[in-house]
Amino acid sequence: MDKQTRVSNVTLRPIGQDDLELIFTHQQDPIASQLAQFPSREREAFYLHWQQNILGQASVLARGIEVDGLLVGNIGHWHMDGQAMIGYWIDRAFWGRGVATLTLSAFLPLVNSRPLFAHVAQHNVASQRVLLRHGFVKMDRLIQEENDTAPLFEFVLA
């Protein structure tokens, strides 16, 4: 598929143990990790995190993002420090094709929590645009999360 080809449809589905190896590979991409401003986890830490904090938590809504039957990323909703959060990760091969926009359009109706927060790297302009397009508002404060390498912009959907 040509890098410039826009994606016309995404499918969201539950994430299973069999998906973790590909999700692990996605988060190992150094360019994606730098853009997300989130360091990649080593294999053991990654699997432990996903099994205990994501797949093992009934309060977490995690979905795989598929394009034409191929798992190209994941999106999730969880609570952190009393805030309802949302975040996603998309395989770099699918950047710039509208996957994030379609994914948020499909995922937001599944999340009833409001306000809903997202934290985005200051240099990740594409993700900032996707959030703004979906009604999120950029707040006038920076957030420093535990694993992040620098402060992040905070966005909120009321």
Predicted regions and their residues:
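Short loop/turn motifs at secondary-structure junctions and domain boundaries
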Residues: 53-59
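Conserved GNAT-fold acetyl-CoA-binding loop/helix
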Residues: 31-51
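Acyl-donor (CoA/ACP) binding surface of acyl/acetyltransferases
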Residues: 1-30, 35, 62-158
